[in-house]
């Protein structure tokens, strides 16, 4: 019986041990969130609910998102692990999600020079882990569009990846072109 948000690291460790994948699906309204949670329950599958900063604003703010998801977990009797994850967040967005009650954050510092990305990531790792959250960081640009911003995609330097990974992040998004 879960009915509460789960740290994404714990769920992914179990997935690796059990040789299965965990999907992350980005949400932007009640209907999508409800559909994803009911499907995860029916399939007995853990799930990560991703929220972009734009979607968080659209839904009324991060406190609203956390309240909606927690309410659905309880009212729909969701009995599988669920993580609520900020997707491609800014420093400010990460801090807001930590305070609002997200269980996981992703800091996208890929547009900063490496030393600045490392400094900001290190601070966020300490804050996130102190509150029991998992944290993902990015090195190199992941191609695609997020909230109207188009990333061309670039290959991350393996040495830079190691430098950021060694900061204690739980997951690393590395640009591969």
Tell what function each PLM region has.
Residues 1-3:
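Short, Lys/Arg-enriched N-terminal segments with co-localized hydrophobic residues
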Residues 6-14, 29-55, 60-79, 88-177:
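Alpha/beta enzyme core
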Residues 19-22, 146-147:
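Short, basic, glycine/proline-bearing loop/turn elements
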Residues 22-26, 84-85, 106:
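Short catalytic-loop micro-motif centered on adjacent basic/acidic residues
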């Amino acid at each position: 019986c879960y009915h509460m948000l789960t740290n994404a690291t714990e769920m992914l460790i179990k997935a690796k041990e059990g040789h299965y994948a965990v999907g992350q699906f980005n949400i932007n309204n009640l209907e999508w969130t409800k559909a994803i949670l009911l499907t995860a329950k029916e399939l007995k599958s853990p799930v990560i609910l991703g929220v972009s900063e734009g979607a968080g604003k659209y839904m009324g703010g991060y406190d609203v998102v956390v309240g909606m998801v927690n309410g659905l977990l309880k009212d729909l009797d969701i009995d599988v692990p669920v993580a609520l994850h900020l997707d491609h967040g800014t420093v400010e967005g990460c801090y807001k999600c930590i305070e609002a009650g997200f269980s996981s954050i992703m800091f996208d510092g890929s547009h900063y020079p490496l030393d600045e990305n490392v400094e900001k990531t290190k601070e966020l790792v300490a804050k996130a882990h102190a509150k029991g959250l998992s944290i993902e960081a990015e090195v190199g640009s992941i191609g695609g569009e997020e909230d109207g911003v188009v990333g061309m995609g670039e290959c991350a330097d393996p040495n830079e990846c190691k430098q950021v990974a060694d900061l204690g992040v739980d997951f690393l998004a590395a640009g591969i072109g």
